[in-house]
Amino acid sequence: MFKQSYQLCLVFLLFVCFYQSVKGNYGKRSKYQKHKGTIPYYSNRYHHARRQTALSRTGKSDSSPFQIILRAINRRPGPQINGRGKKSVTRTLGMLQSVLSQRRGLYNHRSQKSQNVFGVLQNLLKNVRMFKRNIGRLYVSDIVRRRIPTVNAQATARVNVQATAGVNSLTTAVNTDSQTRTLNTLRATGWFKEVSENRLIMQQVLRASLNGVIAGWIETLARRDLMEEFIDYPQAFAIITNTVLSSSQKQLILDLGGNDQLQELLENVPAFTLILNYVQTQDRVQMIVTISETGNMDKLISNLGVLNRFLSNAITPGQTAAIRNLAENGQLEQFIDNQRG
């Protein structure tokens, strides 16, 4: 959040700098200049200096936007940024201050000032890229992973070929031991040909297998012939390989896949995500498997509101056991209908 806010502030300051430089009022006559001509001591800069002197004598400060920006930059970032990141921030702000200082440069002609500022802006933008990389490294170490991961459907369901995968060929992508091991497992299990023919699945495999734990999970799916379930559902495959799943989440996929009951969930990605987030304990896994085995899954996931209320009423082990009994006795359908009210 800090990175995004800081970058927005940086862009805003750049815009103000450029606007003030191009729209400078040095070509205008001051209100004290009564006659045409270029009288040296009747320039705007001269009157600006007089105004600054008067303000300093009265103890007041200049409240112009230019001075406000300069004062904000001079304060520099606080103690929340340290180390290499702080050096990068300070260097970037120093360059920005030099750009703003061009407003008081020696060039009174508008076109000359514009060209001068353009050159400084180009150098500043080059430094911004380095700043973003450094600030990114600074905050990576502050990310605390949760013990049980939560799958975000909005962030993981859409597989972006260019941004998410970032690979164009096997020769440029396979560069780690985990990737090589995963591809060798796909070859050994006979899934390499089908996976390589599906561009989205193949690129997701290459991207996800950079993580050794996720690579092992993909290998497990291949050995149990569960790649067949996901080969036509790249969104669902991205959900289960974009993050390290918990043991209960993996167990649900293996149990449903082994009973050929996983496809109806994969066809409904929002419902699949809700259920995957829900099954954080073994008793919940058993309840979902029982619902699927008794043929009630399709009715349950047909309405996301009903599914949400249903799962919120099955939190404790006692509640999940009661729902399993209803499913086994053929009474679960009526219970699901009651959730619509």
UniProtKB/Swiss-Prot annotation:
Domain of life: Eukaryota
Signal peptide: 1-24
GO cellular component annotations of the record: extracellular region
Keywords: Secreted, Signal
Subcellular location: Secreted
Tissue-specificity statement: Component of the organic matrix of calcified shell layers like nacre and prisms.
Keyword Secreted (UniProt): yes
Name of the protein in its database record: Mytilin-2
